[in-house]
Amino acid sequence: TACTYNNIPLDHCHFLDLPFYETGKIQKNPISEADVEIVRNLLREVKPHQIFVAGDLADPHGTHRVCTDAVFAPIDLEKEEGAKWLKDCRNWMYRGAWAEWEIENIEMCVPMSPEELRGKRNCILKHSSQMESAPFLGNDERLFWQRAEDRNHATAELYHSLGLACYEAMEAFVRYI
């Protein structure tokens, strides 16, 4: 997996096996109370300082949107209950491969070296669904990793054109409040 590739100890990894995803079909179910509780219990246990979710809310497959909802629904419940751990937590949305955030909306940008970008590609390729042509391309025939790399290159070029430092690539994030 991408976690082992990046030397993340498996006891730091949480595989949720959310019920909405386990349909055996292309179309996934809507999130359920069971999905929300699984994620909420993990958040309460870990009390993360940062959460990163896919912000491709209009991806051709639709799964990113459902996954994002499965994370934000329990966060919103925790907010309503005044969970103290949320005071130190930042929620960041990133884009996958279809489009980048508009520059005026980007709130954090992380530069990547050529080696880091290659590592990102290798992590993407650890997911069997990303190794070949994705079944939900939209209007873009490139492989997922190619689209993601091109997006990261373009973001770095845009920042450089604005007079900022030149990097191989950049990953942009928008904060969810």
Regions found by a protein language model. Name each.
Residues 1-84, 122-125, 141-142, 172-173:
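Active-site beta-strand->loop->alpha-helix modules in alpha/beta enzyme cores, enriched
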Residues 14-18, 52-54, 89-103:
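Extended hydrophobic secondary-structure segments that form protein cores and membrane-embedded regions
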Residues 19-24, 99-102, 116-118:
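A short acidic, often aromatic-flanked loop/helix-cap motif at beta-alpha or helix-coil junctions
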Residues 4-6, 28, 41, 80-92, ...:
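C-terminal accessory domains and tails appended to enzymatic cores
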Residues 1, 37, 96-98, 159:
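Residue-level detector of functional hotspots within protein domains
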